[in-house]
Amino acid sequence: MKLLMVLMLAALLLHCYADSGCKLLEDMVEKTINSDISIPEYKELLQEFIDSDAAAEAMGKFKQCFLNQSHRTLKNFGLMMHTVYDSIWCNMKSN
């Protein structure tokens, strides 16, 4: 499960590097770490990225990993992601 989380985050970061301007990445991360969003709501919000039942199940498990975390951990994760957004690697593509 941890490997799945790392791979999904790596894919999101690569998408950011691929000239998304990081807005899509920021929105997805915010939805992922928002503990007020349930798994069914999360899947619905990200439906355009889910192309199979296996992907839907993986997204549900991915969201559950974050739902299992404390508020403090989620806050720290959000802070870490904002540090990534503000890094030279994301800003380099938007300049």
From Swiss-Prot:
The keyword Glycoprotein applies. Glycans are attached at N68. Transmembrane segments: none annotated. GO terms for cellular component: extracellular space. Heterodimer of a lipophilin A and a lipophilin C (mammaglobin B) monomer associated head to head. Residues 1-18 form the signal peptide. Keywords: Glycoprotein, Secreted, Signal. May bind androgens and other steroids, may also bind estramustine, a chemotherapeutic agent used for prostate cancer. May be under transcriptional regulation of steroid hormones. This is Mammaglobin-B. PROSITE patterns: SCGB (PS51311). PANTHER family: MAMMAGLOBIN-B (PTHR14037:SF4), MAMMAGLOBIN-RELATED (PTHR14037). CDD domains: Secretoglobin (cd00633). The keyword Signal applies. It comes from the Eukaryota. GO terms for biological process: androgen receptor signaling pathway. It comes from Homo sapiens (Human). Expressed in thymus, trachea, kidney, steroid responsive tissues (prostate, testis, uterus, breast and ovary) and salivary gland. The gene is SCGB2A1. It is found in: Secreted. Its main location: secreted. Belongs to the secretoglobin family. Lipophilin subfamily.
